[in-house]
A protein has these predicted regions:
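N-terminal alpha-helical transmembrane segments of multi-pass membrane transport
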Residues: 1-128, 143-149, 160
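Extracellular/periplasmic helix-exit of transmembrane alpha-helices
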Residues: 8, 12, 167-180, 287-305, ...
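Extracellular loop-to-transmembrane helix junctions
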Residues: 41-70, 143-182, 368-375, 474-483
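Membrane-interface loop-to-helix entry segments
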Residues: 52, 59, 63-76, 207, ...
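Helix-loop-helix module between adjacent transmembrane segments
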Residues: 59-60, 126-127, 156-181, 192-229, ...
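Flexible loop linkers connecting adjacent transmembrane helices
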Residues: 66-118, 140-142, 146-150, 162-202, ...
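Alpha-helical membrane segments and immediately flanking helix-loop junctions
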Residues: 91-142, 170-173, 179-195, 216, ...
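Membrane-embedded translocation segments of transport machinery
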Residues: 258-274, 279-347, 351-352, 364, ...
């Protein structure tokens, strides 16, 4: 087998052989997770996206549109208005202070234990979702579904806010706190503990293990290799580096940067993300607003194209349904609402009241999808690059849209992409680590083993061309939604 592999590699190249072998072995899993349910003769939608949107709609109605009614409260919690309620000397106050306030027994057990503030938990979770999906994914949606896909992305983002509220509230409610104050939380724990309370301990344990396995796979793939790969491609393209060891060198540098942050644990990750996330989102939005401002006469027509295209699209496969599918699909892939990953980061917050962190998590899909994705869409629609039949797709289309306004703007976008990739990687390293420790035990040896392996995958991702590996890792991330 080794000789045959070497022979094939010599003929086709190592990347191509790995891609082919891996695709043959995992294709069935990818097809299962992303199997499409036909909506019309021309258009289908992955069943996992239907599931995510279905539960998001259910939670939105069940919690009486808390995504809207709780929005101002979320802003107040993040800026620290209610921090005195979490103070250890505040005691247990009477009444339902937040929607779904915690039970006194849990409050007494938890106290104010936790590792990070509300704002740090939000930025840590945001850094895992605000990434290439906001830049490349939006471009893909508009290329296929036209400007109208933007409206359906926004609606899906608003619905996803309630899914985040539910999973992040549970993440805090059922977390474990170690003797040294380290927090262990996420779907692994609320599936195991919550279902055990309801007489389904066996089912809860199985679902928790499945989630942990999928999460580890997603952390190495979509949360790591894909990010380093795309960051390396756009950096080398912008810098003019081609061939040779450019990808390997970029991967090593990125791995060193990632390793430096993740070795310090969640507190260092949160300390980095609370500075990097506002900076990178701010830089990206500022650059986008400059492009929009330079074409301000096209703003109103652009909104007209988005509105009209959402209900009466022209030249889009599947018509109205085709546009709706593209918008919903890209929103689900971007904000990961219902996947469960964010609950791991939010579970480490310093609070007595689980629902207070659930309220904070409402902001995550709003910033990710409603704000960042919408601004990206406006840049693409206003500049009109998507109309060129021979135009690039994905991140390159967005880059071209920026370049059409100011030639050197792709350099700004390159910096934003690298920061997006970096922040996504450090957050997903934490998600994967929590799942790793859940499966293999909480020891320093297991912690270091995971972190070293994670950094090796960073180098690997930047060094090879990804195909089937990317498909599989994406499938692993969305497979997390099934047990969750």
């Amino acid at each position: 087998p080794v000789f045959l592999f070497a022979q094939e590699a010599a003929q086709k190249g190592v990347d191509e052989v790995i891609n082919e072998k891996f695709g043959n072995a995992t294709g069935w899993f990818v097809e299962l997770i992303f199997a499409q349910i036909p909506v019309t003769d021309e258009v289908g939608i992955p069943w996992v996206v239907i599931m995510l949107l279905g539960f998001a709609t259910f939670f939105t109605i069940y919690f009486k549109f808390i995504n809207i009614s709780g929005f101002s409260t979320a802003l107040n919690v993040v800026r620290g208005k209610y921090d005195d309620l979490d103070h250890p000397e505040a005691g247990v106050l009477k009444g339902d202070l937040t929607p779904g306030a915690d039970i006194p027994e849990t409050i007494r057990v938890e106290g104010e234990e936790g590792e990070v503030s509300h704002f740090q938990a939000l930025t840590a979770a945001l850094s895992g979702t605000v990434g290439l999906g906001n830049i490349a994914g939006v471009a893909i949606a508009i290329t296929i579904g036209g400007p109208g896909a933007t409206l359906w992305m926004i609606i899906a983002g608003l619905l996803g806010m309630t899914s985040k509220f539910a999973e992040c509230t549970l993440g805090v409610k059922y977390r474990d706190v170690g003797e040294d104050g380290t927090v262990f939380g996420g779907p692994m724990y609320y599936l195991k503990k919550g279902l055990s309370e309801r007489g389904a301990a066996g089912l809860g344990k199985v679902l928790a293990i499945l989630f942990a396995i999928f999460c580890i796979g997603g952390s190495f793939g979509g949360g790591n290799m894909f990010q380093s790969n795309q960051a390396a491609i756009i950096f080398n393209s912008t810098a003019g580096f081609t061939g040779g060891a450019s990808g390997l060198i970029f991967g090593i540098v990125m791995a060193i940067c990632v390793g430096f942050v993740i070795i310090g644990g969640l507190k260092r990750i949160a300390a980095v993300t609370e500075k990097v996330v506002p900076f990178m989102v701010g830089i990206y939005l500022l650059a986008a607003l400059v492009v929009i401002g330079m074409n301000f006469t096209e703003i109103i027509p652009a909104f007209g194209k988005i509105w009209n295209g959402a209900f009466a699209p022209m030249g889009v496969a599947g018509g109205f349904v085709g546009v709706l599918v593209q918008g919903f699909r890209r929103a689900a892939f971007s904000n990961e609402a219902g996947v469960g990953s964010a609950a791991i980061a939010h579970s480490a917050v310093k609070t007595k009241y689980p629902a207070s962190e659930g309220i904070v998590s409402l902001l995550e899909p709003f910033i990710d999808t409603v704000v960042v994705c919408t601004i990206t869409a406006l840049v693409i629609v206003i500049t009109g690059n998507y109309l060129d039949a021979g135009a690039a797709s994905g991140v390159q289309l967005t880059s071209d849209a920026f370049a059409s306004a100011i030639p050197w703007f792709p350099y700004v976008l390159t910096g934003a992409v690298i920061l997006f990739a970096f922040s996504t990687m450090i957050s997903w390293s934490y998600y994967g680590l929590q799942s790793w420790l859940f499966l293999f035990g909480r020891s320093e040896k297991n912690v270091m083993t995971y972190k070293i392996v994670f950094c090796l995958f960073t180098v690997l991702g930047a060094s090879i061309s990804l195909g089937a590996v990317t498909d599989f890792s994406d499938a692993m991330i969305f497979a997390m939604a099934i047990p969750n």
